[in-house]
C-alpha cells in the first residue's frame, strides 16, 4: 500500500485535525476502488459506475474511524448508518462531529421509537434488527468492528445485509476491522457480501471452494485478491514514524439500561448510608 496521497476533502478536518499520510493513502485507495475521482478542490465524483465497497483492515490504533468518516464525507454519502459495538457509539458521535463540519449525528438506542432526521445514524449491532425496516434508503453504510458479522447466519449479520441492500446507487459501503478474519477465511464472506464484493470472488459457492481450507497457498491467494479489489491494511510497525505520541482521552461509555438502573440504586444506597 502507498504511504501517502495528495487528497482534499471539502468540509473535513481542520488546520489542527488532519489525516496522517498513511490514512490519506488509505482513503485514496478506497476512493479509487469505488470509482471516485477528485476535481482538485476537495469535491469527489463517481466517474466509474461501481457498487462495490471497501474493507479497511488497519491494525488497532491506526485510525480506521477517521478514514471511514473521510470516505463518507468525500462521497457525500448522507444519510449514512454507522453500526458499531454499543460501547463505541458515543465515541463515534464525538469523532464525527469533530471531523465533519456541521454534521448532524443521532445515536439510536432501544428497540422502539421514531427515526429522527440526521446525516449520520449511529447504532449498535445488538439492536440493528429492530431498526432496519425504519430505513427506506440510505447513501452510506459503515460497519465498525465488522468481524462482529463473521457468522453469516446470526441475526446481526442478516440485519447488516438488509441495511447494505438499502444503500442507493452511487452510495458507499465500508467495513472497518483490524481482525476481519479471526479463525478461518470463511469468516470474511459476510463482510464481502455487505460491501457487495463477493461476486469479485466468484460468489459464495466459489469462495467456499477456493478458500474454505485455510492452507498457506489459499490464504496467500486470498490476500492478493482482497488487496487488488477492496482491502487495505497497514501494521503499526509499517507506519510507526508517522504516529504521534500517545494521547489520553476521557471517553463516556453508554451503559446498558438494566445495569445502569442497578448502578444508580447502589449509588443511592451508598449516599444514604453516608
Regions of interest found by a model, annotated:
Residues 176, 235-274:
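Inter-lobe connector of SF1/SF2 helicase motors
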Residues 144-145:
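Walker B catalytic acidic pair
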Residues 78-80, 140, 157-238:
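Conserved P-loop NTPase motor "coupling/switch" region that bridges the ATPase
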Residues 78-98, 182-187:
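Conserved Walker A/P-loop ATP-binding site and its immediately adjacent core
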Residues 112-140:
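Conserved helix/coil segment N-terminal to the catalytic DExD/H
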Amino acid at each position: 500500500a502507498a504511504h501517502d496521497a495528495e487528497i482534499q476533502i471539502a468540509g473535513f478536518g481542520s488546520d489542527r485535525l488532519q489525516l496522517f499520510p498513511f490514512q490519506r493513502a488509505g482513503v485514496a485507495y478506497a476512493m479509487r476502488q469505488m470509482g471516485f475521482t477528485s476535481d482538485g478542490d476537495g469535491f469527489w465524483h463517481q466517474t466509474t459506475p461501481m457498487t462495490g465497497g471497501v474493507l479497511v483492515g488497519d491494525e488497532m490504533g491506526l485510525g480506521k474511524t477517521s478514514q471511514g468518516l473521510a470516505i463518507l464525507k468525500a462521497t457525500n454519502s448522507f444519510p449514512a448508518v454507522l453500526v458499531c459495538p454499543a460501547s463505541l457509539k458515543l465515541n463515534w458521535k464525538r469523532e464525527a462531529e469533530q471531523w465533519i463540519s456541521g454534521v448532524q449525528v443521532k445515536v439510536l438506542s432501544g428497540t422502539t421509537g421514531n427515526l429522527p432526521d440526521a446525516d449520520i445514524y449511529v447504532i449498535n449491532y445488538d439492536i440493528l434488527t429492530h431498526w432496519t425496516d425504519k430505513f427506506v434508503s440510505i447513501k452510506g453504510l459503515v460497519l465498525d468492528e465488522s468481524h462482529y458479522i463473521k457468522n453469516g447466519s446470526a441475526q446481526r449479520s442478516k440485519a447488516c445485509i438488509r441495511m447494505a441492500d438499502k444503500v442507493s446507487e452511487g452510495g458507499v459501503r465500508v467495513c472497518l476491522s483490524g481482525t476481519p478474519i479471526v479463525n478461518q477465511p470463511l469468516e470474511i464472506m459476510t463482510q464481502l457480501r455487505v460491501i457487495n464484493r463477493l461476486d469479485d470472488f466468484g460468489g459464495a459457492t466459489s469462495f467456499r471452494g477456493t478458500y474454505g481450507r485455510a492452507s498457506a497457498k489459499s490464504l496467500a491467494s486470498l490476500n492478493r485478491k482482497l488487496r487488488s479489489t477492496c482491502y487495505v491494511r497497514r501494521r503499526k510497525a509499517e507506519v510507526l514514524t508517522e504516529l504521534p505520541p500517545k494521547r489520553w482521552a476521557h471517553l463516556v461509555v453508554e451503559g446498558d439500561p438494566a445495569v445502569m438502573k442497578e448502578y444508580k440504586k447502589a449509588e443511592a444506597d451508598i449516599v444514604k448510608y453516608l
